[in-house]
Every structure is written in C-alpha cells, then in structure tokens.
C-alpha cells in the first residue's frame, strides 16, 4: 500500500516534536525519502490543484475509479483535474486501450507505450509503463533494449519514429511492410491498436512536458534522501504536502507584468474577427496562399537549438536516436498539403478505426470533441467571452505545422491571435516536447490562469494526436484500396 504524501496530519506540532527526537537519534539509521518536486507539476502551484480537487465532489468518484483501474493516482490525472469533463473522457479512453480485451496483449500494449514515450525521452511515461509491463508478466529482457524485443515489435520502430516526428512521410508501403512480414506480420486490427497507442503516448508526452509533470515520490527521479536545505522545514511537512516556501506565489496572486493590456487586446482581435466574417470572404486562391505562408513561417518559430542529453535508460527503447522533427517546408523539401476535405477524421478515420477496433473510434471522437469545444466562456479575469475563434486558431495551427489544411479556414487569423511567444511554445510542445521549459510556459499568456494554460495543453495534445492519426489512417486506407 502506498501512503499519500498529501495526507494531512491532525497534530503537526506533536509530530514535529517526534521528528526532532527521531532526527537526533542517529542510532535509528532510518532514511526517509523527500519529494524532489513541489506537487504534481513544476509549472502549476500545488495549492491550486489540491484546492480544486477538494472542492469538486464529482472528482472523488473519478479519482476512485482511476485508482481502482490503475492502482495509482498519477500526477497527469491530478493536473487534468482542472477540466473534469475532459478528464473523464480521457480516463475512459485510456481504460479501454489498456484494460479491456483488444487485439494486442497487455505486455505488447505497455511495451508500445514505452516505445512511444521514449521517442521524446519522456522518462515519466516510460517508468509508468515499465512497471505496468513487469506487473503483467512481461519478459524483462525486452527492457534491456529494443533489439531484445520480438521482431514484430522491432518492425514497428520505423512507424513509431515517423509518426512521432515526421508523420507526413508515412505511405502505404510502410503499412504493407508491417502487414506482409511473414511470421512477424501484424493484422490490421493489431496495427490500428498499435497506431492509436503510439499516437496517444506521443501526444501524452507533449502534455507531460507542456505541464511540467513531476514524477511521483515513489518513482525513479521523484525523491531524494538528502535533507532539505530550507530553514524551519520539518520532515513531517512531506506528509502535509508542504515542500518549502519557494517556487510559487500564493493562490490568486498574479505577478505584475508589462503586458497589462494583453488579454484586452486579444479579446478585441477576436471580436473583430467574429464580426468581420459577414464581410466579403477571400477567394480560395487567397485562402490557399495564406495557408502556405503560415506553414512556411512556422519554421521561423524554431524549437530550442540545444537537444537535451539522451537518457540512456530511455533511449535503449528505440532506434535511430538522431531522428527528430524537421520542418517539411525547408528549402529543397516539399510535401504535398494534406487537405482535410479529401481525408478527414469525421468522414474517414473515425469509421476505419471503429470498423477494425470497435468502440475506440467513438471514444476518440468524443475526446477530440470535448477538447476542441471545451469552454467556460472566460479569459483570465473576463467572463461571458466567446473563445471559439481562439480555440480554432490553436487547433488549426498545430495541424498547419503538420501540413494539414482546412479549405474553409482563413489562416490569416492565426497571425492575429497567436503571438510569437505562444507560437514558440506550441511548436516546442507539439514537435519537440522534451525541450519545453518553464520559461516558455511562463512566457505566453502571462495574465491567464494556470487552468487556461492546462486547457491549451489539452488542445495541443488532442490536435497532435488527431494529426498523427490522419496520416497513418490515410496510409492504411490507401493500402486497402
């Protein structure tokens, strides 16, 4: 049984006295772990998360179901508590992918999760699935490196790296190689299950890094045995959830910034765009030109130049460690635009997934719609705000970076609504999440609430997942026809 580090004690004064006596008794030799992180997230104050979780009565049943399912309440779930409607859909989908009988065995499911998370060096997700893989009786030799896994899983490595970094390169030939590999062949149902898992964990790595998720105290990298350096800090504070005094402002306190009119200016632009839609629309040629311009300009907002040093324990789970995201619009490289009017999730991908992996298409569709349409009609301190224009700009910008175009969308809106710091953040979280820093998180939408920034990360995660699925499912459709 794991005791929560957030369980409050009724008599901290008595415990502190006992702690003091125990600490002075060197003969005991007890090593007490101390959490390295302050709460579930490095970016979001712990008090805001815990306060929200305690105020929403419905969250108790959601948490209970999640704990029953997985035997844990992980920090991703705790950060998603800001958006309970989405969280319920997310947990339901993840439960179906991992807990219900499907084309793939539990060992394969969790190993694919390890492979996917490893592409972005997401040790948090890798460690979760290593534990689950072992729990389900997986062969621990596989964990020594991808070369020790069955050939069938190793064959999935090429699709994994393209899906994670350059999904526009996936063709029906890649699908054929997996389906026609002799004794190591995948069935169509197995491949759909694998692709959904890969896309799920690539995008979940984006959310993990985008929200600065901390490892739990019992996980690798989640604790230390060194004494705290903050004065007047007692070991029993660990169980009270008090991890020191530095790091975050009290709940409700907003840092003063130079951008005091940032929110108001954005709201004015949104209103102008919404009111201007009744005016004469641009021609199809002009709309296409604006898309190409936005796609090309997206390369200006480069991800951080410095690659984080590879984690040996993580990188062993995939091949070709140098393979990463590349701007498809760089000079000398041209990839045809993916027109949603020709192949969309609603008209093509949804039915294909549902046919080969029943009910999953419905669950994914519900999750996409909740993330896309989620709104509380608020922006920072303002209420009764229609945020649909802004949400659509964020979603379509992610797809634009992947070369995916909506014919009925004016891409000129993106430049009006998304400033440079926000575009840099989006590109890092979606394309190279392992490079995301607190500086980037703090640097965009400085007057907005943490719950709103978490909402942004939900949009980025789901837009990325749908983009990956569109390319992979289109390749399968082309193979089948």
UniProtKB/Swiss-Prot annotation:
Q: Which organism is it from?
A: Xenopus laevis (African clawed frog)
User: What is this protein's name?
Assistant: Sestrin-1
Per its UniProt record, what InterPro entries does this chain match? AhpD-like, Sestrin
Q: What class of enzyme is it?
A: oxidoreductase
| Tagged with keyword GTP-binding | no
- Write out the transmembrane intervals: none
Return the GO cellular component terms, semicolon-separated: cytoplasm; nucleus
Q: What is the recorded function of this protein according to its Swiss-Prot or TrEMBL entry? A: May function as an intracellular leucine sensor that negatively regulates the TORC1 signaling pathway through the GATOR complex. In absence of leucine, binds the GATOR subcomplex GATOR2 and prevents TORC1 signaling. Binding of leucine to SESN2 disrupts its interaction with GATOR2 thereby activating the TORC1 signaling pathway. This stress-inducible metabolic regulator may also play a role in protection against oxidative and genotoxic stresses.
- UniProt region (N-terminal domain), positions on chain: 63-244
Q: What is known of its domains?
A: The N-terminal domain may have an alkylhydroperoxide reductase activity.
Q: Which family does it belong to?
A: Belongs to the sestrin family.
Q: Which residues form the active site?
A: 122
Q: Which reaction does it catalyse?
A: a hydroperoxide + L-cysteinyl-[protein] = S-hydroxy-L-cysteinyl-[protein] + an alcohol
Per the record, the domain of life is Eukaryota
Which parts of the sequence are annotated with region: C-terminal domain? 310-481
């Amino acid at each position: 049984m794991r005791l929560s580090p957030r369980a409050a004690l009724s008599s901290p004064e008595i415990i502190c006295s006992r702690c003091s006596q125990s600490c002075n008794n060197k003969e005991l030799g007890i090593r007490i772990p101390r959490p390295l992180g302050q709460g579930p997230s490095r970016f979001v104050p712990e008090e805001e998360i815990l306060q929200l979780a305690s105020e929403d009565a419905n969250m108790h049943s959601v948490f209970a179901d999640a704990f029953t399912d997985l035997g844990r309440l992980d920090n991703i779930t705790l950060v998603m508590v800001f958006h309970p409607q989405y969280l319920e859909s997310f947990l339901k989908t993840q439960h179906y992918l991992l807990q219900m009988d499907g084309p793939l065995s539990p060992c394969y499911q969790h190993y694919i999760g390890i492979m996917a998370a490893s592409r972005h060096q997401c040790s948090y997700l890798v460690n979760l699935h290593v534990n689950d893989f072992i729990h389900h009786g997986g062969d621990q030799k596989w964990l020594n490196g991808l070369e020790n896994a069955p050939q069938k899983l190793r064959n999935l490595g090429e699709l994994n790296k393209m899906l994670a970094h350059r999904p526009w390169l996936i063709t029906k030939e890649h699908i054929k190689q997996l389906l026609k590999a002799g004794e190591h062949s995948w069935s169509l149902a197995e491949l759909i299950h694998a692709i959904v898992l890969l896309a799920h964990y690539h995008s979940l790595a984006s959310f993990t890094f985008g929200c600065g998720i901390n490892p739990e105290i019992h996980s690798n990298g989640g604790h230390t045995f060194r004494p705290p350096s903050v004065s007047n800090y007692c070991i029993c504070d660990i169980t009270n959830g008090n991890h020191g005094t530095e790091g975050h402002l009290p709940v409700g306190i907003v840092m003063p910034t130079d951008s005091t009119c940032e929110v108001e200016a954005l709201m004015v632009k949104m209103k102008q765009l919404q009111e201007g839609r009744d005016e004469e629309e641009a021609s199809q040629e002009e709309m296409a030109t604006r898309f190409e311009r936005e796609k090309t300009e997206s390369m200006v907002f480069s991800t951080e130049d410095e690659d984080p040093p590879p984690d040996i324990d993580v990188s062993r789970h995939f091949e070709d460690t140098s393979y990463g995201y590349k701007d498809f619009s760089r000079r000398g490289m041209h990839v045809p635009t993916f027109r949603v009017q020709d192949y969309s999730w609603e008209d093509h991908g949804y039915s294909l997934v549902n046919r080969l992996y029943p009910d999953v298409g419905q669950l994914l569709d519900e999750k996409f719609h909740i993330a896309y349409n989620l709104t509380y009609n608020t922006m920072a301190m303002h209420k009764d705000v229609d945020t649909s224009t802004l949400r659509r700009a964020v979603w379509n910008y992610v797809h634009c970076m992947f070369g995916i175009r909506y014919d009925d969308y004016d891409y000129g809106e993106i430049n009006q609504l998304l400033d440079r710091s926000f575009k840099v953040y989006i590109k890092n979280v979606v394309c190279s999440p392992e490079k995301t820093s607190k500086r980037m998180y703090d640097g965009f939408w400085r007057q907005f609430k943490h719950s709103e920034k978490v909402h942004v990360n939900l949009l980025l995660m789901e837009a990325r997942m749908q983009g990956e699925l569109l390319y992979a499912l289109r390749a399968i459709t082309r193979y089948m026809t």
